[in-house]
């Protein structure tokens, strides 16, 4: 069978000399790989480390499945829904809950969504017509990548049905992993891809979640707030982009390698994935010269150009929710585990009147104070 061939290739290598026996796979998936002929392959690893590889001639319209965490906890069911690129601009709802960089840490992600009253104990959307914004970076560092993506995917549909919205923006770790830069990717993921005889990005490229990621935006405006993973630089301002163009360019390059993205030096594609592009630029929140810090006048021009009052970023990690340029830039990336344990800030709730609150894992909310 194909599976035993894969096993032989994995254990023996191409020259059939035995390699070290493979370590047991750990709970993962499902990866739903859709083919052009309408068929689907569902790949997952169960609690006993067994690879499950099911083929469906056609996809039932209400196809659903259970999602499990890496430690074997049954989390929630997901039903597949149609996927398209969200509008880049939304009207300000009553409440907008903002967080970033979950990095495959399931317990911290779920804890924060419960604290913000976004989900109930069974991971269902209870945030009504409000909006959840996640500023990138689910991949890497942790072992629960798929449960977090599947929860975001599931909540997106539930929010829509309730008149609300879920916004997931592309972070640098999405661009790294999908571009085959796996320096921070846990072994369980690369091992599964090896066992299947493909690269890890190939496993994503054909999948339902991969298709979903390719339709995500990189910059989103909600009311008078702009959200972007890392920041907007003077170089970005000088290139005079409109937001839909940025979103399209990042999507076009999402599954390309670094070499392919940089093939045409100075191109828009190359710029988006480089140091001063929106996915990597740290100069809004770092003042050392090497980061090309943004001066106040250029920030004013950026805010004017995109007709917003402030910018929220993730990417650069701080001890707590931190503000810059008198509230005009707000950094929301914190150490998820440490901030949960030490009861430090973890997310931001924006009210319709513009007031902002730091949200703690305990559910406590305190007004966000300026620097």
Which residues make up each language-model segment?
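Short, small-residue-biased leader/transition segments that mark boundaries at the very start
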Residues: 2-7
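Active-site neighborhood of phospho(di)ester-bond hydrolases with catalytic His/Asp-centered motifs
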Residues: 99-100, 132-136, 167-171, 228, ...
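Binuclear metal-dependent phosphoesterase catalytic core
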Residues: 329-371
């Amino acid at each position: 069978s194909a599976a035993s061939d894969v096993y032989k290739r994995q254990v023996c290598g191409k020259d059939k000399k035995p390699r070290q026996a493979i370590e047991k796979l750990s709970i993962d998936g499902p990866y739903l790989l859709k083919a052009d002929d309408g068929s689907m392959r569902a790949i997952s690893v169960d609690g006993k480390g067994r690879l499950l590889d099911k083929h469906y001639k056609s996809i039932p319209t209400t196809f659903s499945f259970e999602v499990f965490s890496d430690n074997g906890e049954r989390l929630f069911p997901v039903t597949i829904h149609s996927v398209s690129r969200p509008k880049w601009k939304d009207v300000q709802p009553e409440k907008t809950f903002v967080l970033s960089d979950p990095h495959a840490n399931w317990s911290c992600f779920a804890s924060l969504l419960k604290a913000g009253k976004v989900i109930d104990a069974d991971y269902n959307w209870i945030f009504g017509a409000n909006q959840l914004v996640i500023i990138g970076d689910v991949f890497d560092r942790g072992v629960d990548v798929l449960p977090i993506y599947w929860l975001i995917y599931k909540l997106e549909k539930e929010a829509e049905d309730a008149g609300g919205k879920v916004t997931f923006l592309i972070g640098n770790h999405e661009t790294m992993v999908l571009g085959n830069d796996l320096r921070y990717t846990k072994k369980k993921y690369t091992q599964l891809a090896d066992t299947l005889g493909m690269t890890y990005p190939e496993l994503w490229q054909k999948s339902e979640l991969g298709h979903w990621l390719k339709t995500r935006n990189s910059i989103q405006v909600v009311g008078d707030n702009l959200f972007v993973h890392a920041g907007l630089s003077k170089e970005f301002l000088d290139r005079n982009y409109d937001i839909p163009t940025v979103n399209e360019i990042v999507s076009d390059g999402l599954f390309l390698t670094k070499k392919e993205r940089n093939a045409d030096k100075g191109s828009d594609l190359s710029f988006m994935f480089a140091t001063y592009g929106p996915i990597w630029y740290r100069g809004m929140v770092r003042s050392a010269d090497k980061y090309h810090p943004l001066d106040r006048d250029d920030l004013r021009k950026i805010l004017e150009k995109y007709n917003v009052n402030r910018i929220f970023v993730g990417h650069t990690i701080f001890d707590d929710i931190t503000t810059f340029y008198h509230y005009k830039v707000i950094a929301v990336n914190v150490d998820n585990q440490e901030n949960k344990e030490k009861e430090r800030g973890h997310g931001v709730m924006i009210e319709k009147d513009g007031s902002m609150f730091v949200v703690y894992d305990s559910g406590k909310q305190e007004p966000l104070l300026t620097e």
